[in-house]
Amino acid sequence: MKTTKALSIFMLVFALLLGACQRNVTRNGDGSADVETIVTQQELQEAVNASVADPLIKELTVSLQSGYILVSGTRERLNDSSKTDTLSFRIDLGVSNGQLTSTISDAQFDGFTIEQNRLDLWNTTIANRIAKLGQKSPNSTLDSVSITTSEVTMTWTVSK
């Protein structure tokens, strides 16, 4: 009875973990596996919102374009919350040494360039959060990432 209960709990937890994003697995002859994970626009929206983590930034919207991600929103002014500035930036995702990279460009508050140290922090946290959505094994390396108007697809090699 205990074994059946433990197995049922394990299967439930496993199903919940797999439900986070879609994945396809292909076994290779050397014992490794190629895993393709798909991250939805909603999952990206949540990852970018959490990465920006600025209480003054409101209504952040993630829009998937062919090859990149467009982000827009508003930011309350620190000295006058009744006034807002528009925020926009582009995110390009890539792969370097088996890890996901994020590169923000064209980042502006009301036409003024956003400071680089803020962009560096956002790049790091965005890449880490999106990678966590797709990478489910610590012994995996990212091979490729692609962005379409409906999803982000990452292909990983998982070694045994």
Q: At which residue positions do the language-model features occur?
A:
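Sec-dependent bacterial lipoprotein signal peptides
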Residues: 1-19
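Extracellular/lumenal and peripheral-membrane lipid-interaction modules
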Residues: 21-160
